[in-house]
C-alpha cells in the first residue's frame, strides 16, 4: 500500500488500529504526566512561546525522541540556528523523553511547531490543535521511508515468520508507542495480520527509540527489534560498524516522509516567516550539508489533507 498524504495514512491507521483492537482514532490524550515532566525540564525554553511573531521572540521547536538527546542536539542545532538567522525569530529546541511529551507540550502551548512522525502528527492535529504545513524530502529526493524488523547479523532468522515461530524464546525491542515505523506499522503488518499480540507473544517486550533498539540488537542485548530506513541510513554514516552487525528480516510498505506541524493559533507573521524559510532552505552547499545531517534535502508544502 502507498499512502498519498496524512489523510490517506490516517484512514489506514483507523482501520489498522480497529483491527488490532486498540483505541479508536481521535479523542483521548497523551500521557499528561510525561508532558508535565517534559514541560518542567523545558520551562525556560518555553517562556516566550505566547509572544511569537515579533523580532527576536522565542519559537519552541519540538523534536521527537528517535535517538539520544545528545545526537539530536548535534544534528539539529545548526539547522535551528539557521532558522533563527533567516526568520529573525529565536528558534529553541524542545526535547522530551518520548513522543507523547512533544504532543502534550504542543497541546499546552509549550511548543509552537514540531517535527513528528505520521502517527504522532495525527495525534497533534487531533489533540493539540496542530496543523501540518510541511513535509520533509529525503536526501536522495524521495518522500517516503520504510519500517524494518531487525535481528543480529549472526541470527539464524531470515524472515518475520521465522521470528514469530520462536517468539516465546525471544526478547523484542519495540518502538515508542507513538512511533509510526517503530510501533504502529509493524504492529499491523507483522503482528495483527498474523493474529498475534507483540506484548504477549515474546518472552519479553521492551520499548525504546530507534537508535536504542538498533544498538541493543547489534550488541545482542535483545534478539529482535523495530527500526526504519531513515535510522539505518543515519547509522551507516555515524556507526557503520553497528550496521554490519544487523540483518533485516522484514520491510514494510512505504510510509510518507515526516510532517512538520505548527499550532493553528500561532500568529500569521511567524507562520509566514517560518514557511518562507523552510520552503527555500537547502539551496546552498552549506544548507545542504546541514539538512544532510538530518537525512533530508529540502522541504515541500503539505497540509492536514
Give each language-model segment a name.
Residues 21-24:
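C-terminal motif of bacterial Sec signal peptides marking the signal peptidase cleavage site
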Residues 40-42, 47-122:
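Extracytoplasmic small-molecule ligand-binding "clamshell" domains
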Residues 56, 61-84, 96, 144-214, ...:
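Bilobed "Venus flytrap"/periplasmic-binding protein-like clamshell domains
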Residues 60, 64-65, 139-148, 240-278, ...:
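Periplasmic-binding protein-like
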Residues 90, 165, 170-189, 273-305:
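Ligand-binding clefts/hinges and TM-proximal coupling segments of bilobed small-molecule sensing domains
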Residues 115-128, 189-192, 218-219, 223-243:
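A ligand-binding cleft/hinge motif common to bilobed small-molecule-binding domains
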Amino acid at each position: 500500500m502507498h499512502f498519498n498524504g496524512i489523510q490517506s495514512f490516517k484512514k489506514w491507521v483507523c482501520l489498522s488500529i480497529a483491527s488490532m483492537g486498540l483505541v479508536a482514532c481521535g479523542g483521548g490524550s497523551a500521557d499528561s504526566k510525561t508532558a508535565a515532566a517534559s514541560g518542567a525540564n523545558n520551562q525556560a525554553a518555553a517562556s516566550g512561546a505566547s509572544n511569537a511573531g515579533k523580532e527576536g521572540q522565542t519559537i519552541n521547536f519540538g523534536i521527537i525522541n528517535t535517538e539520544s538527546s545528545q545526537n539530536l542536539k548535534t544534528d539539529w542545532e545548526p539547522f535551528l540556528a539557521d532558522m533563527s538567522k533567516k526568520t529573525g525569530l529565536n528558534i529553541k529546541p524542545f526535547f522530551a523523553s518520548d513522543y507523547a511529551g512533544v504532543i502534550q507540550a504542543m497541546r499546552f502551548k509549550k511548543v509552537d511547531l514540531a517535527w513528528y512522525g505520521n502517527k504522532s502528527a495525527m495525534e497533534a492535529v487531533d489533540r493539540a490543535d496542530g496543523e501540518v504545513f510541511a513535509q520533509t524530502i529525503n536526501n536522495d529526493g524521495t518522500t517516503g521511508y520504510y519500517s524494518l524488523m531487525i535481528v543480529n547479523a549472526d541470527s539464524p532468522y531470515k524472515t518475520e515468520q521465522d521470528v514469530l515461530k520462536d517468539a516465546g524464546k525471544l526478547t523484542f525491542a519495540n518502538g515508542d508507542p507513538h512511533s509510526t515505523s517503530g510501533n504502529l506499522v509493524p504492529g499491523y503488518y507483522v503482528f495483527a495480520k498474523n493474529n498475534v499480540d507483540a506484548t504477549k507473544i515474546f518472552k519479553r517486550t521492551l520499548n525504546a527509540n530507534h537508535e536504542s533498539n538498533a544498538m541493543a540488537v547489534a550488541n545482542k542485548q535483545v534478539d529482535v527489534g523495530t527500526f526504519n530506513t531513515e535510522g539505518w541510513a543515519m547509522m551507516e554514516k555515524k556507526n557503520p560498524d553497528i550496521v554490519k552487525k544487523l540483518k533485516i528480516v522484514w520491510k514494510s510498505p512505504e510510509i510518507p516522509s515526516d510532517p512538520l506541524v505548527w499550532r493553528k493559533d500561532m500568529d500569521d507573521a511567524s507562520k509566514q516567516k517560518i514557511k518562507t524559510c523552510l520552503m527555500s532552505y537547502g539551496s546552498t552547499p552549506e544548507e545542504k550539508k546541514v539538512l544532510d545531517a538530518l537525512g533530508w534535502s529540502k522541504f515541500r508544502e503539505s497540509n492536514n489533507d
